[in-house]
Amino acid sequence: MGYEGMPKQMRLEEAIMYCLVNEGRGLSVPQLTYLINRERLHRRKDGNPVTDEQVWACYFRNRHTFVWEGGIIHLVM
């Protein structure tokens, strides 16, 4: 548990993986951003929602985990 009884937030790459697995398919950056923010899976350090740019940057840093194909992010299997 996090502070004041709130569950601990996922890291952004964990939140992306969670969304991809739960949806059972690849998703676009805007779709991932929407799901992560709707479910409050990850928040920025300032408490604001995640941006498309952050999701894109996370994909780019984790290309060993994710693959970009036709505008869609997939898990590497």
Regions found by a protein language model. Give the residues of each.
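Hydrophobic residues on short alpha-helical segments
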Residues: 13-20
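Short helix-capping/hinge SLiMs at alpha-helix to coil transitions
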Residues: 21-25
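Charged low-complexity interaction tracts in eukaryotic proteins
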Residues: 2-13, 30, 37-77
